[in-house]
């Protein structure tokens, strides 16, 4: 099985989830979307499980591949409002890897792990899937857009999303599902960093 996996926290990210599903649909078996009741800081989410309110924004013919996980992690996060180290090493890592505890996977399953605003080009899927068969785990390089979706950050690499066989991370929990031992040699998509209004921030 081939899975695209992400998590989201805000209505402004729905458009990115739709883009990822549209690009990936012909190449994946399922799109795992996790929504959490807590934030990276360890504080409660401002929006309590809103994904189902937006499901009708996805084309009906594409919804069959969505697996929506409503994730309660209030007893698992650590308060980290003033502690970036704990926020990144524990809370963020938990949110990236929590899906492992909610579904069953086989060793040879492939997981493409992206943040909500990281979009993989559909035409690059055959190449990255071939690469993961050869290497087991690969970091993906994206074009970086900042603040507006047409503000390209020239000469900026964004190397963070990971594509890996499940067996590469199955003995870590929660696994970070970021980066990788090698980086795919071409840019394979776009990262829309802080592409939102001031109110949405």
List PLM regions with ranges:
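Conserved catalytic core of nucleotide-sugar-dependent glycosyltransferases
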Residues: 118-201
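Short, solvent-exposed beta-strand-terminating loops
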Residues: 34-42, 192-197
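Active-site-proximal specificity loops/subdomain of glycosyltransferases
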Residues: 36-113, 122
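A short acidic (Asp/Glu
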Residues: 15-19, 42-46, 79, 120-129, ...
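N-proximal low-complexity "stem/linker" segments adjacent to membrane-targeting elements
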Residues: 1-26
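Short His-Asn-centered micro-motif
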Residues: 5-11, 34-35, 113-116, 140-143
């Amino acid at each position: 099985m081939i899975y695209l996996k992400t998590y989201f926290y805000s209505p402004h990210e729905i458009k990115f989830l739709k883009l990822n599903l549209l690009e990936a649909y012909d190449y994946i078996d399922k799109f795992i979307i996790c929504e959490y009741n807590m934030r990276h800081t360890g504080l409660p989410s401002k929006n309590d499980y809103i994904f189902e309110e937006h499901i009708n924004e996805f084309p009906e013919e594409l919804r069959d591949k969505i697996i929506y996980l409503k994730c309660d992690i209030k007893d698992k996060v650590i308060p980290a409002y003033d502690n970036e180290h704990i926020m990144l090493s524990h809370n963020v890592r938990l949110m990236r890897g929590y899906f492992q505890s909610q579904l069953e996977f086989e060793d040879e399953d492939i997981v493409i792990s992206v943040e909500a605003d990281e979009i993989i080009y559909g035409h690059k899927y055959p190449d990255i899937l071939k690469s993961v068969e050869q290497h087991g785990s690969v970091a993906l390089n994206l074009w970086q857009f900042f603040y507006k979706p047409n503000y390209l950050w020239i000469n900026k690499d964004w190397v963070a999303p990971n594509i890996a066989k499940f067996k590469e991370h199955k003995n870590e929990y929660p696994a970070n599902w970021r980066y990788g031992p090698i980086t795919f040699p071409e840019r394979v998509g776009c990262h829309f960093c802080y592409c939102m209004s001031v109110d949405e921030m």
